[in-house]
A protein has these predicted regions:
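ATP/adenylate-binding site constellation spanning eukaryotic-like Ser/Thr protein kinases
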Residues: 116
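Catalytic P-loop NTPase motifs of RecA-like helicase/translocase cores
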Residues: 11-12
Length: 137
């Protein structure tokens, strides 16, 4: 797998030492050789769970790599809105819809998430499923 998209569950596990998946996130990161893409809304969503020090650490980690932050152009909002509408019964958040949009644009199906229920339902263009990367348990 050349690239994966990271959801907030992965970043939270990585950034909070007491998270039960912290060691698994660190181990995955140490072994993974591909690119990790983080949509900018996922950065915002992740910071909600962090202390100020953890927010600063996350931003420093993102600045240094190996992850790349993907910004969303305003032109994407109509498509993201359509994705939100398509999955309204799941009550998706903006970050999830942004991940679906970005995955379509990048042709990237791999995702680092703890939200296997929703990402098992979301579909990319052409009906393709996400490939949920096993990074914990």
């Amino acid at each position: 797998m050349a690239a994966v998209i990271a959801d907030s569950g992965f970043l939270v596990a990585l950034g909070i030492r007491r998270d039960p998946r912290h060691a698994a996130a660190k181990s995955f990161l140490a072994a993974y050789k591909g690119e990790i893409v983080v949509p900018s809304p996922v950065v915002v969503e992740s910071c909600f769970f962090f202390s100020t020090a953890a927010k600063i650490s996350l931003l420093d980690w993102l600045r240094k790599g190996p992850a790349r932050v993907a910004e969303l152009p305003p032109q994407a909002y109509a498509e993201i809105g359509a994705i939100l509408g398509r999955y309204a019964s799941l009550d998706p958040d903006f970050a999830d819809a942004a991940i679906v949009w970005l995955a379509d644009k990048l042709g990237c199906r791999g995702i680092l998430t703890v939200d296997t229920r929703d990402f098992g339902v979301y579909r990319l263009k052409g009906g393709k499923r996400f490939e949920i990367v096993r990074w914990f348990g």
